[in-house]
From Swiss-Prot:
Keywords: Decarboxylase, Lyase, Pyrimidine biosynthesis
List of catalytic residues: 64
Organism name: Pseudomonas syringae pv. tomato (strain ATCC BAA-871 / DC3000)
Annotated EC: 4.1.1.23
Catalytic reaction equation(s): orotidine 5'-phosphate + H(+) = UMP + CO2
One GO biological process term: 'de novo' UMP biosynthetic process
UniProt similarity note: Belongs to the OMP decarboxylase family. Type 1 subfamily.
SUPFAM superfamilies: Ribulose-phoshate binding barrel
The UniProt record lists the keyword Nuclease: no
Protein name from the UniProt record: Orotidine 5'-phosphate decarboxylase
Function: Catalyzes the decarboxylation of orotidine 5'-monophosphate (OMP) to uridine 5'-monophosphate (UMP).
GO CC, one annotated term: cytosol
Key word Cell membrane present: no
Length: 232
């Protein structure tokens, strides 16, 4: 059973193990989970997951796998064997790819990570989608991919909080993981479709990914506590 008692996931967006662990040392695994992304994992490989789990953290491995079905499924299996709590793949990889990932996890014994689909990145707006041949609103594409993910047996979705309400209404069984969360008064940085933590939960998000407002705070533990207090 997870020790974490909140929906907060802190993004460890750092280039080195030392920097990531320095922040982790200031955080309480009862108050947050942690996310390991491409930069940190490429630098440290599975060692960083092992180190974070050793400190009691649930780890969200945010590598957004996207490849042919067998290759993606084997990557998801490797993540599960690493002991991660959550792993994600791009829904745009298609139904067969997502279903292969679901199947490989069901064939394993022991704890299973949550299998999450990535819909439309929170940095993308309509003009960005048009640039890759999809001349539709991001919300429309999100709903299309969500239906595909549910059909494939995914546990949930990564989505903007602005899509959460519609997704919960259409797919109530899917758990929603929302990046781009910025506490009131924080800079937007490179996220575009954002809400505050309280707004995101009220909209239907189940987990909230928060990066710089905590990781770059003068006192990360205090910043985390403030977010948790906002959600109480």
């Amino acid at each position: 059973m997870s020790a974490c008692q909140t929906p907060v996931i802190v993004a460890l967006d750092f280039p080195t193990r030392e920097a990531a662990m320095r922040l982790a040392d200031q955080l309480d695994p009862k108050l947050c989970r942690v996310k390991v992304g491409k930069e940190l994992f490429t630098s440290c490989a599975s060692d960083i997951v092992e180190a974070l789990r050793g400190k009691g953290f649930d780890v969200f491995l945010d590598l957004k796998f996207h490849d042919i079905p067998n290759t993606t499924a084997m990557a998801v299996k490797a993540a599960a064997e690493m002991g991660v709590w959550m792993v994600n793949v791009h829904c745009s990889g298609g139904l067969r790819m997502m279903a292969a990932c679901r199947e490989v996890l069901e064939q394993r014994t022991g704890p299973q990570p949550l299998l999450i689909g990535v819909t439309v990145l929170t940095s993308m707006e309509r003009e960005d989608l048009a640039g890759i041949g999809l001349d539709i609103d991001p919300q429309v594409q999100v709903l299309r991919l969500a239906a595909l993910a549910e059909k494939a047996g995914m546990d949930g979705l990564v989505c903007s909080a602005l899509e959460a309400q519609a997704l919960k209404a259409a797919h109530p069984s899917l758990q929603l993981v929302t990046p781009g969360i910025r506490p009131a008064g924080s800079a937007q940085d490179d996220q575009r479709r954002i809400l505050t933590p309280r707004q995101a939960l009220d909209a239907g998000s189940d987990y909230l990914v928060i990066g710089r407002p905590i990781s770059q705070a003068a006192d990360p533990a205090k910043a985390l506590a403030a977010v948790v207090a906002e959600l109480a």
